[in-house]
């Protein structure tokens, strides 16, 4: 297997870390992604959990420096159960929101319910996804979960959110348009 000692450990350059921390008060949101690059175990004896915790330690510094900062986790197809576990147990509790598609949601549902992947009822997909989203929201404590696939978007938000449903809908429409344009390119 291919092993890149930097890119597949989510190592942030010291220059980036210093710069982001210096200017973090100018940001309202910070998107966290890239966990699909991790490996479960590394030749040096470290694990994905070591690098997940290292990244979260830095994100905590950003939040301490600028408490209003919102952290958004954008999911991707993750290659190993150990990484999914690390995301569910360590990453999501630190996030304010997340975005994911049906494949990624199915992994979370599988993990939460101790089921095999792709056990969804093809005739009741929306019900399956919606119940899985609610279960994930309850377990994770996330304020917002954005579910997106080619057929529809669903956004679960906590009632304590200060953003109106109309503004949430407008944001979802905009993201749908952008995603559609990217598909055409």
Task: State where each predicted segment sits.
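Ribokinase/PfkB-type carbohydrate-kinase core domain
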Residues: 1-185
